Amino acid sequence: MFRPLVKRVVTRRFLAAANNSNAHIEIRTLEDLAKLQSLDNVDPKLISKLINDKTNELNIKNELQMLKQLQAEEQKTQETSLKKFVRPAWIFLLMGSIVYLSCHYVWWKLDYEEKELEYTHKVHQLESELAALNEAHNSSVSSDKNSKRSSRKWYKFW
Protein backbone atom coordinates (compact mmCIF):
# COMPACT_ATOMS: atom_id res chain seq x y z
CA MET A 1 0.00 0.00 0.00
CA PHE A 2 2.77 2.37 0.75
CA ARG A 3 4.71 1.40 -2.25
CA PRO A 4 2.36 2.93 -4.86
CA LEU A 5 2.08 6.04 -2.73
CA VAL A 6 5.84 6.37 -2.41
CA LYS A 7 6.23 5.76 -6.08
CA ARG A 8 3.71 8.51 -6.88
CA VAL A 9 5.36 10.99 -4.53
CA VAL A 10 8.81 10.31 -5.93
CA THR A 11 7.51 10.71 -9.47
CA ARG A 12 5.81 14.02 -8.63
CA ARG A 13 8.88 15.37 -6.91
CA PHE A 14 10.99 14.36 -9.88
CA LEU A 15 8.61 16.13 -12.26
CA ALA A 16 8.47 19.19 -10.03
CA ALA A 17 12.26 19.27 -9.89
CA ALA A 18 12.39 18.96 -13.66
CA ASN A 19 9.89 21.82 -14.06
CA ASN A 20 11.83 23.94 -11.62
CA SER A 21 15.05 23.20 -13.49
CA ASN A 22 13.31 24.28 -16.73
CA ALA A 23 12.29 27.52 -15.11
CA HIS A 24 15.83 28.24 -13.99
CA ILE A 25 17.44 27.53 -17.39
CA GLU A 26 17.66 30.62 -19.55
CA ILE A 27 16.41 29.78 -23.04
CA ARG A 28 18.22 31.62 -25.83
CA THR A 29 18.34 29.17 -28.75
CA LEU A 30 16.43 26.24 -30.16
CA GLU A 31 19.16 23.95 -28.83
CA ASP A 32 18.25 25.09 -25.31
CA LEU A 33 14.64 24.14 -26.06
CA ALA A 34 15.76 20.73 -27.30
CA LYS A 35 17.51 20.08 -23.98
CA LEU A 36 14.26 20.55 -22.05
CA GLN A 37 12.13 17.55 -21.22
CA SER A 38 8.84 19.33 -21.85
CA LEU A 39 7.69 22.64 -23.28
CA ASP A 40 4.84 23.11 -20.80
CA ASN A 41 6.32 26.06 -18.92
CA VAL A 42 7.86 27.77 -21.97
CA ASP A 43 6.19 30.85 -23.44
CA PRO A 44 4.82 30.13 -26.97
CA LYS A 45 5.89 33.60 -28.12
CA LEU A 46 9.46 32.75 -27.15
CA ILE A 47 9.28 29.51 -29.13
CA SER A 48 7.90 31.26 -32.23
CA LYS A 49 10.54 34.00 -31.88
CA LEU A 50 13.33 31.42 -31.69
CA ILE A 51 11.92 29.52 -34.68
CA ASN A 52 11.64 32.73 -36.71
CA ASP A 53 15.19 33.75 -35.78
CA LYS A 54 16.57 30.37 -36.83
CA THR A 55 14.55 30.46 -40.05
CA ASN A 56 15.89 33.92 -40.88
CA GLU A 57 19.43 32.79 -40.14
CA LEU A 58 19.06 29.76 -42.43
CA ASN A 59 17.50 31.90 -45.16
CA ILE A 60 20.41 34.34 -44.99
CA LYS A 61 22.89 31.45 -45.19
CA ASN A 62 21.07 30.01 -48.20
CA GLU A 63 20.99 33.40 -49.92
CA LEU A 64 24.71 33.90 -49.32
CA GLN A 65 25.43 30.43 -50.65
CA MET A 66 23.27 31.10 -53.71
CA LEU A 67 25.04 34.44 -54.33
CA LYS A 68 28.42 32.70 -54.11
CA GLN A 69 27.25 30.10 -56.62
CA LEU A 70 25.98 32.82 -58.96
CA GLN A 71 29.29 34.67 -58.74
CA ALA A 72 31.20 31.45 -59.43
CA GLU A 73 28.97 30.69 -62.44
CA GLU A 74 29.38 34.26 -63.72
CA GLN A 75 33.16 34.02 -63.48
CA LYS A 76 33.05 30.65 -65.19
CA THR A 77 30.93 32.02 -68.03
CA GLN A 78 33.24 35.02 -68.39
CA GLU A 79 36.22 32.70 -68.67
CA THR A 80 34.54 30.43 -71.20
CA SER A 81 32.88 33.19 -73.22
CA LEU A 82 35.90 33.38 -75.53
CA LYS A 83 35.87 29.61 -75.98
CA LYS A 84 32.28 29.81 -77.16
CA PHE A 85 33.28 31.99 -80.12
CA VAL A 86 36.44 30.23 -81.29
CA ARG A 87 34.74 27.46 -83.27
CA PRO A 88 32.11 29.74 -84.86
CA ALA A 89 34.90 32.16 -85.79
CA TRP A 90 36.82 29.39 -87.56
CA ILE A 91 33.67 28.27 -89.34
CA PHE A 92 32.96 31.87 -90.38
CA LEU A 93 36.50 32.31 -91.71
CA LEU A 94 36.35 29.02 -93.58
CA MET A 95 32.97 29.79 -95.14
CA GLY A 96 34.08 33.32 -96.00
CA SER A 97 37.23 31.99 -97.65
CA ILE A 98 35.24 29.46 -99.67
CA VAL A 99 32.79 32.13 -100.83
CA TYR A 100 35.61 34.55 -101.68
CA LEU A 101 37.58 31.94 -103.65
CA SER A 102 34.52 30.71 -105.55
CA CYS A 103 33.49 34.28 -106.45
CA HIS A 104 37.07 35.08 -107.48
CA TYR A 105 37.17 31.93 -109.65
CA VAL A 106 33.89 32.87 -111.36
CA TRP A 107 35.15 36.42 -111.95
CA TRP A 108 38.45 35.10 -113.34
CA LYS A 109 36.66 32.65 -115.63
CA LEU A 110 34.30 35.32 -117.00
CA ASP A 111 37.21 37.72 -117.50
CA TYR A 112 39.16 34.98 -119.30
CA GLU A 113 36.25 34.21 -121.63
CA GLU A 114 35.76 37.93 -122.34
CA LYS A 115 39.44 38.41 -123.16
CA GLU A 116 39.44 35.23 -125.24
CA LEU A 117 36.58 36.59 -127.36
CA GLU A 118 38.33 39.93 -127.65
CA TYR A 119 41.60 38.30 -128.70
CA THR A 120 39.92 35.98 -131.26
CA HIS A 121 38.16 39.00 -132.77
CA LYS A 122 41.49 40.86 -132.87
CA VAL A 123 43.22 37.81 -134.44
CA HIS A 124 40.54 37.59 -137.17
CA GLN A 125 40.87 41.31 -137.80
CA LEU A 126 44.67 41.09 -138.03
CA GLU A 127 44.44 38.00 -140.27
CA SER A 128 42.10 39.82 -142.63
CA GLU A 129 44.45 42.83 -142.66
CA LEU A 130 47.39 40.54 -143.31
CA ALA A 131 45.53 38.78 -146.11
CA ALA A 132 44.59 42.13 -147.62
CA LEU A 133 48.17 43.38 -147.36
CA ASN A 134 49.49 40.13 -148.77
CA GLU A 135 47.06 40.34 -151.65
CA ALA A 136 47.97 43.96 -152.27
CA HIS A 137 51.65 43.10 -152.13
CA ASN A 138 51.20 40.16 -154.50
CA SER A 139 49.29 42.30 -156.96
CA SER A 140 51.92 45.05 -156.80
CA VAL A 141 54.73 42.53 -157.22
CA SER A 142 53.02 40.89 -160.21
CA SER A 143 52.40 44.28 -161.81
CA ASP A 144 56.03 45.21 -161.17
CA LYS A 145 57.17 41.96 -162.76
CA ASN A 146 54.96 42.59 -165.74
CA SER A 147 56.30 46.09 -166.08
CA LYS A 148 59.90 44.95 -165.64
CA ARG A 149 59.49 42.18 -168.20
CA SER A 150 58.08 44.53 -170.71
CA SER A 151 60.92 46.96 -170.24
CA ARG A 152 63.54 44.30 -170.74
CA LYS A 153 64.62 43.12 -173.95
CA TRP A 154 63.72 39.66 -174.91
CA TYR A 155 67.24 38.47 -175.43
CA LYS A 156 68.34 39.45 -171.95
CA PHE A 157 66.26 36.71 -170.55
CA TRP A 158 68.72 34.19 -171.96
From Swiss-Prot:
<feature type="topological domain" description="Mitochondrial matrix">
    <location>
        <begin position="16"/>
        <end position="85"/>
    </location>
</feature>
<feature type="transit peptide" description="Mitochondrion">
    <location>
        <begin position="1"/>
        <end position="15"/>
    </location>
</feature>
<feature type="topological domain" description="Mitochondrial intermembrane">
    <location>
        <begin position="109"/>
        <end position="158"/>
    </location>
</feature>
<keyword id="KW-0143">Chaperone</keyword>
<keyword id="KW-0812">Transmembrane</keyword>
<feature type="transmembrane region" description="Helical">
    <location>
        <begin position="86"/>
        <end position="108"/>
    </location>
</feature>
<dbReference type="GO" id="GO:0005743">
    <property type="term" value="C:mitochondrial inner membrane"/>
</dbReference>
<keyword id="KW-0809">Transit peptide</keyword>
<keyword id="KW-0496">Mitochondrion</keyword>
<comment type="similarity">
    <text>Belongs to the INA17 family.</text>
</comment>
<keyword id="KW-0472">Membrane</keyword>
<keyword id="KW-1133">Transmembrane helix</keyword>
<keyword id="KW-0175">Coiled coil</keyword>
<keyword id="KW-0999">Mitochondrion inner membrane</keyword>
<comment type="subunit">
    <text>Component of the inner membrane assembly (INA) complex, composed of INA17 and INA22. Interacts with a subset of F(1)F(0)-ATP synthase subunits of the F(1)-domain and the peripheral stalk.</text>
</comment>
<protein>
    <recommendedName>
        <fullName>Inner membrane assembly complex subunit 17</fullName>
    </recommendedName>
</protein>
<feature type="coiled-coil region">
    <location>
        <begin position="110"/>
        <end position="140"/>
    </location>
</feature>
<comment type="function">
    <text>Component of the INA complex (INAC) that promotes the biogenesis of mitochondrial F(1)F(0)-ATP synthase. INAC facilitates the assembly of the peripheral stalk and promotes the assembly of the catalytic F(1)-domain with the membrane-embedded F(0)-domain.</text>
</comment>
